[in-house]
Amino acid sequence: MAALNVLVSGCGRFLRGLLTGPTVTSWARPPARGFREVVEIQEGKTTIIEGRITGTPKESPNPPNPSGQCPICRWNLKHKYSYEDVLLLSQFIRPHGGMLPRSITGLCQEEHRKIEECVKMAHRAGLLPNHRPKLPEGFFPKTRPRLNRYLTRWSPRSVKPIYNKGHRWNKVRMAVGSPLLKDNVSYTGRPLVLYH
């Protein structure tokens, strides 16, 4: 049904374009999606509510730093994003989750590496669930091995975390985050700790 409507409206535009002459050049193009506003018109006892197409909006505003070498630098976002900003990160990734190359994104080398690290961290945190490569038909992925395979003698639920990983002056710390993001702005009073 939708295909029939598109065909009929396309033929109608084509015929209108032929009848009005060569002065109108927009008949061959599909209709542009403009912004619409709702207008109420009162005629006696009847109220007509119609949507009118308004003019197209202005182009995007000028960046605050037009001399920057990449989009992140131009919009002064250099140290102001993290792996949680998925709307920003989704502009630099492909539909299946991989990074777009620098020739397409226009990022400088430093920011490309930071965005790449943030995308990895967002994938690991489960913040980008829709960006996964599609599996071919009939292919079933292998089940992942359970993480605590070494605990086969007792139930995995009986495990307690290791609260004390050594003396305070000689603890074995776990790496968290990425050293590439160490210059990012911290909005809390605590300093950034890369080892917990």
Swiss-Prot record:
Gene Ontology cellular component list: mitochondrial inner membrane; mitochondrial small ribosomal subunit
SUPFAM superfamilies: Ribosomal protein S18
A Gene Ontology biological process term: translation
Molecular functions (GO terms): small ribosomal subunit rRNA binding; structural constituent of ribosome
Keyword Mitochondrion: yes
Record keywords: Mitochondrion, Ribonucleoprotein, Ribosomal protein, Transit peptide
Compartment list: Mitochondrion
Top-level division of the source organism's lineage: Eukaryota
Gene3D superfamilies linked to this entry: Ribosomal protein S18 (4.10.640.10)
Coiled-coil features, chain-numbered ranges: none
Pfam families found in the cross-reference section: Ribosomal_S18 (PF01084)
Residue range covered by the transit peptide: 1-34
rRNA processing in keyword set: no
Subunit structure: Component of the mitochondrial ribosome small subunit (28S) which comprises a 12S rRNA and about 30 distinct proteins.
Family to which this protein belongs: Belongs to the bacterial ribosomal protein bS18 family. Mitochondrion-specific ribosomal protein mL66 subfamily.
Protein name according to UniProt: Large ribosomal subunit protein mL66
